[in-house]
């Protein structure tokens, strides 16, 4: 009988589920391994083939670790609060809870058909009341510890959504999720004091096995700057302006002071004749998103207040201006401008004809631009002649001695704007009293769930949908007759994802978020796989919450995720005509290198999968046609896991053929054990290949180089196929090595080999270094026929040369941003990639 995944895969999925194979409990006698996927938002669209990429990676690692004797926790759940369900409710009137549960059923079915080894007994959704209870409990702990507070702040307001967005949700003046324009507006909001943990969030990165680029993104977002605060007294006793600068040694070069439009001193210092111009400028600035204001390439605008400050170092009069490129949320919202040594200040001074005073010696032409480097101080009084570092220390000491300044560390990071004007989120569990005070809802009143509503839309004035539920809003303090009002803002979607990894450890616990024994056994997460787009959103927020939970004794580790891996994106071909209209790939044909949808010529591009671009590939269709094992194996074989890769259905066909070859290695035409599988000793060459393959596949799995591991499996399969007599020892090794990647067929082949139980816990094959002694040689990598790289690898690499070349960091960099249209392999010598730019 030929290989038939439509029968094999449901059989083994039913076996695993029926025997609770992947259900796991605490076992102190065994080492633990906790692997976690960034759990999905269950949208109405269901999965596309990009979703299983990371899920397959963690599943391979989990199946491998079980075979290495680890006690493996591999859970799955649903990040189920979110704006799409609320939008759907506004369009259809169907409650978000109904839509969400229906979508979860779809997602769960799709995931289960792919054969992932999840412990489904731990499944939950962030919308489950039992989970909402503990999310709200954590908020109360934040509130009790002074880390949650209300403030009147300038917020990112999205008129299209009638909602406030966090800074991290806005890019280039638009909401990153929808592309809707965003404006600035002042509102009273709930904030979380993440800045109190800025240093610890920075320091904690050092001990984490995370991609360096992602750690750099978090460091840059936190943005630690060492410098000084300096007090500039205003003329006529109008007060003092305190500025923060990272270059206090340039104080003698300050020629004017800049204030953010929101700075509280502006109204007090502006001269009457300038008040109208200043007010108009501030009004215009308030409508600009901060990333626009801070754009280095934007024209530097400003308005003079008529006021002057005094330089404490030399008594110089410095005009005080308002400029929108100064941000109120960074530093003190005031800058001392040193145009000779700061490009932005130089541009501003040049535009407004303000003095430019050189205070650092250099050969740079000050008439052409600012010199931002270091050097010997000039025109700087007692600092003259000192180098920049020495001058920096000297001026800070002088400022301290004279009471006009002090050392200071500042952060780019701002407190987390936490509240949302939405319905489908966790209600914030506080009560507002008549005297203006706020009290936490007693813990015994949790969970506080959102009420039923007929209208889920926020109001244009920013009033949240929950405000419409007057019977719910108007309440009393529990246990009293004191009237109170509930908070009508809700938490952001990020709240539920900040701590879900902990609830998976102990999902049935009704007395605490996570039990002490479970947390101390399973934490930290050993492998966390997800997209790099979460670098300064989910990952930063989760680390913050985890450190708070550490401080209050809920968890025993300071960091939640020890190893992080960012999978790349699976792209797909899209087809678009000159008017921008997209066409389904099935409607497009190629004619002599050109593409047509009927009579319309279209352009082919490689883009992110999107419903709007008609290029989404549904995994259900792939599983139906080729099988789940083929989909899993193909996605691992496409290239390095962290690289972006275009989907090619032809590649799935090739992997399916490999699985058919694997089937024929073990089975004969009548579906029994092939008569050529014998209890025979392997030849020296095959024995050596067997041990080499175990070594390289093991190393590749540990390093998450799954594409090269699959190539090695193909090499071993080719060798076994060529054997007239296939030694059982090598055949069984092949099946066990295949198991993490293609578990259904591996289970079936293992049973054909006469084993009565699942191979889930069969020991991983070992290798003998003495039997390997690999010879190496140099290989060449060409791109469009030109030699671009050379590398050393095994002399008998064969077809695995292609995957080995793709995994070379230099080659990955050379191929980044390009589409590989053809791969030419010359075994034993070279690989040539024929590419075109994206």
From Swiss-Prot:
GO terms for molecular function: aminoacyl-tRNA deacylase activity; ATP binding; leucine-tRNA ligase activity. It comes from the Bacteria. Its EC number is 6.1.1.4. The keyword Aminoacyl-tRNA synthetase applies. Transmembrane segments: none annotated. Keywords: Aminoacyl-tRNA synthetase, ATP-binding, Cytoplasm, Ligase, Nucleotide-binding, Protein biosynthesis. It catalyses: tRNA(Leu) + L-leucine + ATP = L-leucyl-tRNA(Leu) + AMP + diphosphate. GO terms for cellular component: cytosol. It comes from Rhizobium johnstonii (strain DSM 114642 / LMG 32736 / 3841) (Rhizobium leguminosarum bv. viciae). This is Leucine--tRNA ligase 1. It is found in: Cytoplasm. One of its GO terms (biological process) is leucyl-tRNA aminoacylation. The keyword Translocase does not apply. A motif ('KMSKS' region) lies at residues 608-612. Belongs to the class-I aminoacyl-tRNA synthetase family. It holds the Pfam family tRNA-synt_1g. A motif ('HIGH' region) lies at residues 40-51.
